[in-house]
Amino acid sequence: MAEIKNYTLNFGPQHPAAHGVLRLVLELDGEVIQRADPHIGLLHRATEKLAEQKTYLQSVPYMDRLDYVSMMCNEHAYVMSIEKMLNLEVPLRAQYIRVMFDEITRILNHLMWLGAHALDVGAMGVFLYAFREREDLMDCYEAVSGARMHAAYYRPGGVYRDLPDAMPQHKASIIRNAKAINKLNENRQGSLLDFIEDFTNRFPTYVDEYETLLTDNRIWKQRLVGVGVVSPERAMAMGFTGPMLRGSGIEWDLRKKQPYEVYDLLDFDIPVGTNGDCYDRYLVRVEEMRQSNRIIKQCVEWLRNNPGSVMTDNHKVAPPSRVDMKSNMEDLIHHFKLFTEGFHVPVGEAYAAVEHPKGEFGVYLISDGANKPYRMKIRAPGFPHLQGLDEMAKGHMIADAVTIIGTQDIVFGEIDR
């Protein structure tokens, strides 16, 4: 009798559900996955090596391009690592701005994840809803930095500039009449803080809409419940962090366990799952959006009542103001020196980690006293998650592999680096 062999199938890297350039080699017994072998490196851009040839400040934009849907959180870990080595005091207002934008970034990431995950599983509508809200948050990025994605807004010692007093207005065009423009500009009459506050008031209703579409949806539950189950012990052993770890029932969040910036002054809860399956991870992330909204509300209130500096007063790191630079020769020389040679960091090493939307994102820097890092190592949260794909997918059908890749929230920019 003929021997029945397992079938090998290439999944990706052009597959629409592959989340970028994921290539999986699947070993199948019929339609059941026996082994899932992820092949990485198709988006490798040598970020860690490039940082060794750039000044500390010039590497900030590289951080945006690691996990390119959670831009400012990547920058945050990097600048915190530099600040540790320089013993820099960051003004309180800058810390609140950073935390507010970290949480805006978390919502941006989770909206992208929710829309893409639902689309992979077959729910088209949620994708369109999620992108409606992302527009407003992208406008916040644009208001502070001029860019809708790669902001490069954080700086060692603070942030690039204070929050603007006015929001840009939409103008009438061929594709939009005056009535539509007035509707778009309704909540743009005040400052950026007014715009963000208006968003935080509307957002809980939007999250309820997503839950109405998905949470009790029979097909959604059939596709997610009991799929990709990871026990708490295995989640810890495999190095899972973020929603992947909390979905398995372990309450570990750097914002609570190792508070950085002003998280210890804010009131929020950490959602935790019970079953460790795709459905629990979905519920954890949806609740995280609500908690992020709470944090943003508190930051807006504090920032409104406490004006102040947003950059350290250590001028070995902080450039002079534009006004001084254009009226004073010494300040111009100072500015030129900071942006050509850059500041020198004392010999030493530092690791700083943030609670990134995907897990623990860490940057380990080693300095030899020069104006460039001797070595930079990035701890990408998605890397251990992708490593666990083989264990999570074993025994499931091919269709479930798509669900499991979706629940891991994989972005290859940070995995391949």
UniProtKB/Swiss-Prot annotation:
Coiled coil: none annotated. SUPFAM superfamilies: HydB/Nqo4-like. It comes from the Bacteria. It is a peripheral membrane protein. It is found in: Cell inner membrane. Keywords: Cell inner membrane, Cell membrane, Membrane, NAD, Quinone, Translocase, Transport, Ubiquinone. GO terms for cellular component: plasma membrane. One of its GO terms (molecular function) is NADH:ubiquinone reductase (non-electrogenic) activity. Its EC number is 7.1.1.-. It catalyses: a quinone + NADH + 5 H(+)(in) = a quinol + NAD(+) + 4 H(+)(out). It holds the Pfam family Complex1_49kDa. Belongs to the complex I 49 kDa subunit family. NDH-1 shuttles electrons from NADH, via FMN and iron-sulfur (Fe-S) centers, to quinones in the respiratory chain. The immediate electron acceptor for the enzyme in this species is believed to be ubiquinone. Couples the redox reaction to proton translocation (for every two electrons transferred, four hydrogen ions are translocated across the cytoplasmic membrane), and thus conserves the redox energy in a proton gradient. PANTHER family: NADH DEHYDROGENASE [UBIQUINONE] IRON-SULFUR PROTEIN 2, MITOCHONDRIAL, NADH-UBIQUINONE OXIDOREDUCTASE 49 KDA SUBUNIT. NDH-1 is composed of 14 different subunits. Subunits NuoB, C, D, E, F, and G constitute the peripheral sector of the complex. This is NADH-quinone oxidoreductase subunit D. It comes from Herminiimonas arsenicoxydans. The lineage of its organism: Bacteria, Pseudomonadati, Pseudomonadota, Betaproteobacteria, Burkholderiales.
